[in-house]
């Protein structure tokens, strides 16, 4: 069965890094992957061409696709747009909402070749391999009511932190399944000593636990989890948490690895349709210079093959190819050591392609 892949380069460095990832996708097709590749506009590119960050044709193509590969959205040229619903980032949020992408997978994996690039001592982070499972469509980012209004002569801003049982249960199942496939440890992060919504979160996680007797469930308050990620990160295997806490913790975990330019992500719905993107942003300050790191986007393709396209062997080939290139000493500027000459975006992509094809 032929699969459909939609590529959305987006803004900033997005077109440069997705170009390298598409090379790898085409190599996968040559290796037997039955898939068609289509390209579309999103974010600032959508605004410039159609006046909206998520054009109708892009959304229609995304709904028809098995997987979406996104580069990055946003840039200073669109920061003056006063209507927040017309900002580039709303294109990303619109895709998440319309595709019902409730589960976000953010690996924090330290490649041994890059251990010295971490901000922590090598002995603390060596062998680090964490998967953060973040609920993506509920919580305080989407809760109603919300707004800014006048009360008693002053402006008041308010938001609603809300989770329904079914939202917690479905992300919980994703996390338990992930822990079962990995090291068998799941840490649920909440703030159940203060927030009723996360008291319910903890109750639902506890209720699911007997269905997964091979997974050891623990709980941690989010403030302690942030501290433990820096103090002793290797205690974690899989972390599951809500939208806001996951947003913060996954970025903190990302920097344990030395470069956010190495880290992919996946956002899935219940049918395993997914959107795959690097964890980094559009980096407008280096856009067009050919120096961006494409590895996070290439590794996002590996996640796509594993979780949406049922091609885990090809995913492993990509991951091995990235390891080979790092073994060869090739580094883009963000992961280059002092005294080493960084390679270009294209050179890094070509090297991964060669290592992939050599297997």
From Swiss-Prot:
Cofactors required: Mg(2+); Mn(2+)
Subcellular location: Cytoplasm
The protein's enzyme class: oxidoreductase
Positions marked as site (Important for catalysis): 141, 191
Record-listed E.C. numbers: 1.1.1.85
Annotated signal peptide: none
Gene Ontology CC terms, in alphabetical order: cytosol
GO terms of biological process kind: L-leucine biosynthetic process
Positions bound to substrate: 96, 106, 134, 223
Keyword Mitochondrion listed: no
Binding site for Mg(2+): 223, 247, 251
Domain of life: Bacteria
GO MF, one annotated term: 3-isopropylmalate dehydrogenase activity
SMART domains: Iso_dh
Tagged with keyword DNA damage: no
Note accompanying the cofactor annotation: Binds 1 Mg(2+) or Mn(2+) ion per subunit.
PROSITE patterns, per database record: IDH_IMDH (PS00470)
Catalytic function, reaction form: (2R,3S)-3-isopropylmalate + NAD(+) = 4-methyl-2-oxopentanoate + CO2 + NADH
Keywords of the record: Amino-acid biosynthesis, Branched-chain amino acid biosynthesis, Cytoplasm, Leucine biosynthesis, Magnesium, Manganese, Metal-binding, NAD, Oxidoreductase
Residues bound to NAD(+): 281-293
Pathway(s) this gene product operates in, as recorded in its UniProt entry: Amino-acid biosynthesis; L-leucine biosynthesis; L-leucine from 3-methyl-2-oxobutanoate: step 3/4
Assembly and interaction partners: Homodimer.
Family from the record: Belongs to the isocitrate and isopropylmalate dehydrogenases family. LeuB type 1 subfamily.
Stated role: Catalyzes the oxidation of 3-carboxy-2-hydroxy-4-methylpentanoate (3-isopropylmalate) to 3-carboxy-4-methyl-2-oxopentanoate. The product decarboxylates to 4-methyl-2 oxopentanoate.
Protein name: 3-isopropylmalate dehydrogenase
């Amino acid at each position: 069965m032929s699969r459909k892949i939609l590529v959305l380069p987006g803004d900033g460095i997005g077109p440069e890094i997705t170009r390298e990832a598409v090379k790898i996708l085409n190599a996968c097709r040559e290796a037997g992957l039955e898939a068609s590749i289509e390209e579309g506009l999103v974010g600032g590119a959508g605004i410039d061409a159609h006046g909206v960050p998520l054009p109708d044709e892009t959304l229609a193509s995304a709904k028809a696709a098995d997987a979406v590969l996104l580069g990055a959205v946003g840039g200073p040229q669109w920061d003056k747009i006063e209507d927040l619903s017309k900002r580039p980032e709303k294109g990303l949020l619109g895709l998440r909402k319309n595709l019902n992408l409730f589960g976000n997978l953010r690996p924090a994996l330290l490649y041994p070749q890059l251990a010295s690039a971490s901000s922590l001592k090598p002995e603390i982070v060596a062998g680090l391999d964490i998967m953060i499972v973040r609920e993506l469509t509920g919580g305080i980012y989407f809760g109603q009511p919300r707004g800014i209004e006048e009360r008693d002569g002053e402006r008041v801003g308010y938001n609603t932190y809300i989770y329904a049982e079914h939202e917690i249960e479905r992300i919980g199942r994703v996390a338990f399944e992930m822990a079962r496939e990995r090291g068998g440890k799941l840490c649920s992060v909440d703030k159940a000593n203060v927030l009723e919504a996360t008291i319910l979160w903890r109750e639902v996680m506890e209720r699911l636990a007997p269905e997964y007797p091979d997974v050891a469930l623990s709980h941690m308050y989010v403030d302690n989890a942030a501290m433990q990620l820096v103090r002793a990160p290797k205690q974690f295997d899989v972390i599951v948490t809500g939208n806001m806490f996951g947003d913060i913790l996954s970025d903190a975990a990302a920097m344990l690895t030395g470069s956010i330019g190495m880290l992919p992500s996946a956002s899935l719905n219940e049918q395993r349709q997914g959107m795959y993107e690097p964890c980094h942003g559009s980096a407008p300050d280096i856009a067009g210079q050919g120096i961006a790191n494409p590895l996070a986007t290439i590794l996002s393709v590996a996640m796509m093959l594993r979780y949406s396209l049922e091609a885990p062997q090809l995913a492993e080939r990509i991951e091995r190819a990235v390891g080979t290139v790092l073994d060869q000493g090739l580094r883009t500027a963000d992961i280059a050591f002092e005294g080493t000459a960084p390679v270009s975006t294209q050179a890094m992509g070509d090297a991964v392609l060669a290592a992939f094809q050599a297997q």
